[in-house]
Amino acid sequence: MSKTHLTEKKFSDFALYPPIVEVLDSKGFNNCTPIQALTLPTTLAGKDVAGQAQTGTGKTLAFLTATFHHLLTHPAAEGRQTNQPRALIMAPTRELAVQIHSDAEPLAQATGLKMGLAYGGDGYDKQLKVLEAGVDILVGTTGRLIDYTKQNYVNMSAIQVVVLDEADRMFDLGFIKDIRWLFRRMPAAAGRLNMLFSATLSYRVRELAFEHMNNAEYVEVEPLQKTGHRIQEELFYPSNEEKMRLLQTLIEEEWPDRCIIFANTKHRCEDIWGHLAADGHRVGLLTGDVSQKRRLRILEKFTQGALDILVATDVAARGLHIPSVTHVFNYDLPDDCEDYVHRIGRTGRAGESGCSISLACEEYALNLTAIESYIGHQIPVSKYNSDALLTDLPAPKRLTRRRSGAPRHNRKRPG
């Protein structure tokens, strides 16, 4: 981590439950990020907080630290049953829920608190088996949580801590009714520690906090610019005919260690995947049509370095912390300005630098004006020589012929 990303405040400065400090220290977390330094004094005192911070700022560790400390320093409800978790962490997507659960595992192992997962699309019986054994902290998405609650596999009446992560995304995906349904089955707000985190503290997010939290303190961590000052942005204007060749040429020139390519539709993502896989790249595909088991395998391979490139729709643009992503390519400029910020926020995280390259083609160039207005600056434009683009590229693979990719082969440019 870069020192400029951290504050002078140390985790050891707080009166944290000792095993928590030991885990943080073993993982190299000594100094707090701004969102951690600003929220922990409030949450560790048992007071509610609504925090605004972009992804990659350390908010997950902020609420996990507070959650574990609170449970370890406060007794469970008297007469608590096996199906009654003590803490509930709600996330908008299953990928984010899995990520939070993974981040919490070292703390769980060190403290003896039991973790559970509840998300749709996969593993119903496997998740249920863990819940039936009893969990202290339950991480999940609203649909599966409601399912388990309605069948009395989970009872929310002994909840002591509630975390709502990516609250603005919850609104975008239409989950707010589900969240309110779950809140109504918990103890009153005054009897819980409530934490909410969001990329924006809009009126609707503040209204949610007012309804279901107890005089929450609002904490805002604004970046120097919405896109992050460690991200180098670049923009090209390709024709539709040259767009794919330009992408492949840029990948060849940049040779990114680990990159994510975003496109606006699953069909476009499949097309990109086919071209790159045929060209020998170690590339994975992440869209809504990919099964949950395969999505998790792809993310694991990408995180561990078995894949160099991930082609994705915006399903992967929020919440996922994949370390050391060096490049983000916007093959299509997004229709939603916020999606641009969230996409390129996959790189330049936790004090690292990153590179974002966008292609403003004939189809999506009209989105650029709104994006630049939203981020508050113009994206630097670069030019390319059409004659220098790669030409002897293989025909794209069909999606049904998924393979991990063969060794890259040498190519020549014309001239």
Curated annotation (Swiss-Prot):
Family annotation (Gene3D superfamilies): P-loop containing nucleotide triphosphate hydrolases
Composition bias of kind Basic residues appears in 398-415
| Name of this chain's protein | ATP-dependent RNA helicase RhlB
Please tell me one Gene Ontology term that the record gives under cellular component.
cytosol
**Residue ranges of the region described as Disordered:** 396-415
Name the keywords, alphabetized.
ATP-binding, Cytoplasm, Helicase, Hydrolase, Nucleotide-binding, RNA-binding
Q: Which SMART domains match?
A: DEXDc (SM00487), HELICc (SM00490)
Task of the protein: DEAD-box RNA helicase involved in RNA degradation. Has RNA-dependent ATPase activity and unwinds double-stranded RNA.
The scientific name of the source species is: Sodalis glossinidius (strain morsitans)
